[in-house]
Amino acid sequence: MNQPKSAPNSTDSAQGLSYRDAGVDIDAGDALVDAIKPFARKTMRDGVLGGIGGFGALFEVPKKYKEPVLVSGTDGVGTKLRLAFQLNKHDTVGQDLVAMSVNDILVQGAEPLFFLDYFACGKLDVGTAATVVKGIAYGCELSGCALIGGETAEMPGMYPDGEYDLAGFAVGAVEKSKIIDGSTIAPGDVVLGLASSGIHSNGFSLVRKIIERAQPDLNADFDGRSLADALMAPTHIYVKPLLALMQQIAVKGMAHITGGGLVENIPRVLREGLTAELDHRGWPLPPLFSWLQKHGGVADAEMHRVFNCGIGMAVVVSAADADAAIGLLSAAGEQVWKIGVIRESAAGEAQTVVI
């Protein structure tokens, strides 16, 4: 004989569910907005209309531009975030996020105007998120662009507790007549290399594999700081010194050295038939890259196509302008070297070779 189904517990059914019960804390989101407003406020610049919190962010292109062309870029920080989780170090990845996009749009001559961020997590930790956004705001200050908006997505079940993902979006402007596209690069031009601050934000899947193999003490001293701090050093932002250089020197082309290293990024600004011949003796290989190569048994060719190997930005100028450009960049605090020359390609030759 079938037993009658039990009636729902009247106490359970009377108690309604809330968004918090589902894992989304609206109050935490509001607290984060309040916490980050002072950071965003410090990035405000001419062109910003309104503040944080609206449905859309408004920006007026500065009147100094006669024929402005908008240049946009988007990027993330990649698996460097996994190392940040492991080390519980969240104060520098925000600068990484900004750098990856503003350095990209800079190579076409664009001045970064504004930036937006996307922070996604499973459970929002206000302290961690605020630390990340503070770093984003600092990166915007270094770039001269405004942090005018963003999105914080708390999505239960999508990410493990304590983990998050980031995406950033930069928009800049350049005069139409001053777009840098590499079309004027010619044989005899010089390739200048601007020093990186470390690994930047590419190659971290290999970095993590090397760490797994070598099992180093990440807190041990490494070249004057902990190995952890050396690995997590934030991506250098080249915006202000290079915008100043463009006012005084005819910059023919630039390449942000990201995934693919020198050998895959410099060709992106070279027309067919040209090769950048780089001399590996032209700049010092930083100790961190030597450490990675040694402990990972990484071949030279693989190093050059995965890591920046100490060069975060390549700049192409005429031979006549090279010394002046080095002087201006050095005066602005950059380390810079002549790392190569442009020549005609041999038959079947790659567009960037390291000798």
Swiss-Prot record:
Enzyme Commission designation: 6.3.3.1
Q: Where does the source fall among the domains of life?
A: Bacteria
EC class of this enzyme? ligase
| Swiss-Prot/TrEMBL keywords | ATP-binding, Cytoplasm, Ligase, Nucleotide-binding, Purine biosynthesis
Q: What is this protein called?
A: Phosphoribosylformylglycinamidine cyclo-ligase
Pathway given for this chain reads: Purine metabolism; IMP biosynthesis via de novo pathway; 5-amino-1-(5-phospho-D-ribosyl)imidazole from N(2)-formyl-N(1)-(5-phospho-D-ribosyl)glycinamide: step 2/2
Care to name a GO molecular-function term for this sequence?
phosphoribosylformylglycinamidine cyclo-ligase activity
Gene Ontology CC = cytosol
Name the gene for this chain: purM
Positions of transmembrane segments: none
Q: Which family does it belong to?
A: Belongs to the AIR synthase family.
Pfam families noted in UniProt: AIRS (PF00586), AIRS_C (PF02769)
The record's section on InterPro entries has: PurM-like_C_dom, PurM-like_C_sf, PurM-like_N, PurM-like_N_sf, PurM_cligase
Q: Which reaction does it catalyse?
A: 2-formamido-N(1)-(5-O-phospho-beta-D-ribosyl)acetamidine + ATP = 5-amino-1-(5-phospho-beta-D-ribosyl)imidazole + ADP + phosphate + H(+)
Q: Cellular location of this protein?
A: Cytoplasm
